[in-house]
Amino acid sequence: AALPSLTTIVATAFATISAAPAHAADSDTSVPPEITMPGSPDGIPSAGNGPIKLFTYPASVYALAHPGTNPQGANNFSCKPREGQNPVVLLPGTNSDAYASWSMYAPKLTKLGYCVFSPNFNGLKLLPNFAYTGDIRVSAKAVSGFVDRVLTATGSKKVDLIGWSQGGGPLPNYYITKLGGDKKVSKLIALAPSNHGVGPRAVSRFVNESISEAKHKKIEATFAKAHIASYEQQLGFSNFNKELYGNGPVTRPGVMYTVIEGRYDVAVVPFTYAFLNEPGVKNILVQDTCRNDHASHVNFTYDVNVYQMAVNALDPDHAQPVTCVFQPFIG
């Protein structure tokens, strides 16, 4: 799955409130160090190319059994973009990695002539396909360095980002707004992004606003120690989310934003939380074009209708009509 169960988040939060000692040190809330994922030195999947998968669950199982698997066509640092194209960086979701998220996208985009890259950072060593569980700020710094490496290798001035879940929401938006990414990103194409939080709004508000600030800090510290800070950060009323999205526009001039979301998303609830309601953002509801698309959050990067929309967003001057294909609900 791309996002933690909200039940897991709530249970962890209240276990923290009852179990954490009253003298827990404030230093526990410090940003944890970046963790290099197994099989992905410097963030680059290096365990060989994996087969193309058509659904997220087979891809995730394969990624777990083969840490550091590279999606076909990705991370070729000798690739030079065609004229008019930027290198494309694919950002995975929480609890996922480059292969599990992008085993379908990477080879398809490569066949279209794009230079495609996708990194693994900041996850759980014991579950080697669970990347991006750690503090989003740390992940964003790692992504910043990865983008710089891509720009240097390709001789490009900017990249286009395609991201799913966290990888389309708080991760790239933190990089763009806080780490100078607005000078290096041409397009952000966000697939089912967790922009305004995951899970039901009422539960998110209860966890983050119905407890004292001291207890809130203990919760943050516990998640950080377990290297799952991004779980708490993606609650809509987390301090991180409020800092990133609650202080004026999150979009930046010069970056073209596209958000693609489906109404059957069971992680970003309501699905409208994915959208950025700011000037210049193109928010796309999949069912406005493909009414028989029932894909949920976890299978969103294996939805062929969404893929066509993403390709159109990459190259809007040559956009093609979407050929809709029935997509079952896979939650």
Model segments located where?
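Conserved alpha/beta-hydrolase
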Residues: 108-127
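C-terminal catalytic-base region of ester-bond hydrolases, centering on the histidine
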Residues: 210, 250-331
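Flexible, membrane-associating and regulatory peripheral segments of lipid-active enzymes
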Residues: 3-4, 13-107
